[in-house]
Amino acid sequence: MWNDTQMTEIVIPPVDWRVATQLSIIFGWASVLLVIALFVPRSRTRIVGYLAMVGAMVAAAVGIPLWGVNAETFSGMLRLDSYSLTLNWLFLAAAAITMVLSLDYLPRQGIERSEYYVLVLFATGGMMLLAQGADLIILFLGLELLSIVLYVLTGFAYPRNASEEAGMKYLLIGAFAGGFVVFGIALLYGATGSMNLRAIGETLAQQTLTLEERIYLLAGAALVVVGFGYKVAMAPFHMWAPDVYEGAPTPIAGLLSVGSKAAGFAALLRFLVEALAGEWQIWAPVLAVLAIATLAVGNIGALTQRNVKRMLAYSSIGHAGYILFGVIAAGAPGGIAGQRGVEGVLLYLIAYTFTNLGAFGVLIALEHRGEAAWDMSDLAGLWSRRPWLAVAMAVCMLSLAGVPPTGGFWGKFYVFTAAWLSGMGWITVIGVIVAAIAAFYYLRIVAQMFMAEPAREVPLPMDRALRAGLALATLGVLILGFLPTPAIDLVQRVVLGG
């Protein structure tokens, strides 16, 4: 029997619900919608979509009074600061635009089901966990939640074989990525005795690790980076991206290219800067080589594509290389380079989110004929057939190319400047050269739309929801380009702590 001396009191630490407010709204509302969806007939699926968007907007609005909060809860595992709050807003915006674009797409493709919108909300919650995670366990939980939901959404267009194949490929490769992260976490815990990112960084700064422990730490860190490298489609862990993007439902391909990538970089940046800042001299050159390899693979692959959806997949790989420039700079010792690195990553992700969602939105508008709408020839003479669509696609292509005055220009400018200030001038020069070469395949699409002979087919009219989603994405790109000051002020305040 137990006696009083053997009993230990269990103390539950207080919970700061400000930190978990947005997460609670998203997960709670998604769970409610899952029940509501059971009673909504298939012909009224849009109701669930509208309700899901309301939940995303409420979660975003609730975050406004939380600006300036810098707090942790659940024993330091979950953190809310200006960095994570900004990324949460970005994820919620991406989810809302994705759902708007899906309202017309799903019924046209015959895959309209209520659970689609619920799954998008759960995916958004996974992204937010990756942004707010201050502990390796939370980062892994967010990674797995996001991945599992996206496996389902990628294969959502069953019984279309391409979608099922894409879902299976993503599942198999994602499982390997998760395995790398788990092994990496085990080694990091074995070396430092902690899973908290700041605690790992403090242990490393004290220089009390033995040689064996330091080897375990670096090996564990490498495995975690490999795992997140799969998530952001960083070379040589990019192999899944073209096939998965092509086979996935087009709105989900857009969400994969922006939300999943942004969440992966959010976690990777926090991990490297907080836990491994003391080893910058080791991991920065390695990431620099991987960044150049990612640029090369992505842009060379995109140059050879006639399928616009696959081209955007390779383009997404290439853009991961540019974002890595900012990640490298963010961990650099000294003030200005690190600050500019974080600013560059955030600004690039904001611009890239609106740009890529707009580009995929145009493909959705043309997809009434199935896969043929993804061929370069389907864009021929688009200016004559649908001027508004041609302008939207041109704006997005120019932004992806980094042409001023679009949002993409400011993103590239900041990450290139950050890399230069960090002492990595050689990757900056290579990045500028590659960006100039990459402009060819973006401008090729613009020329196809405005200068080629128009196709004979008469396109179907666009749904109002699709028009609204495209307008939001395109206006976001233009506003970031012509009026960048608010976005720049926002990311600068993030670095300065609000």
UniProtKB/Swiss-Prot annotation:
Statement: the UniProt record of this protein carries the keyword Cell cycle: no
EC id: 7.1.1.-
Reaction it catalyzes: a quinone + NADH + 5 H(+)(in) = a quinol + NAD(+) + 4 H(+)(out)
Chain segments annotated as transmembrane: 19-39, 47-67, 83-103, 114-134, 136-156, 171-191, 215-235, 249-269, 282-302, 317-337, 345-365, 389-409, 420-440, 468-488
Keywords carried by this UniProt record: Cell membrane, Membrane, NAD, Quinone, Translocase, Transmembrane, Transmembrane helix, Transport, Ubiquinone
Top-level enzyme category: translocase
Main localization (coarse): membrane
Subcellular location: Cell membrane
Membrane topology classification: Multi-pass membrane protein
Coiled-coil residue windows: none
Any one GO cellular component localisation term in the record: plasma membrane
Pfam family, any one: Proton_antipo_M
One GO term (biological process): ATP synthesis coupled electron transport
GO MF annotation list: NADH dehydrogenase (ubiquinone) activity; NADH:ubiquinone reductase (non-electrogenic) activity; quinone binding
Subunit structure: NDH-1 is composed of 14 different subunits. Subunits NuoA, H, J, K, L, M, N constitute the membrane sector of the complex.
Task of the protein: NDH-1 shuttles electrons from NADH, via FMN and iron-sulfur (Fe-S) centers, to quinones in the respiratory chain. The immediate electron acceptor for the enzyme in this species is believed to be ubiquinone. Couples the redox reaction to proton translocation (for every two electrons transferred, four hydrogen ions are translocated across the cytoplasmic membrane), and thus conserves the redox energy in a proton gradient.
Similarity annotation: Belongs to the complex I subunit 2 family.
Name this polypeptide is given: NADH-quinone oxidoreductase subunit N 2
Source species of the chain: Roseiflexus castenholzii (strain DSM 13941 / HLO8)
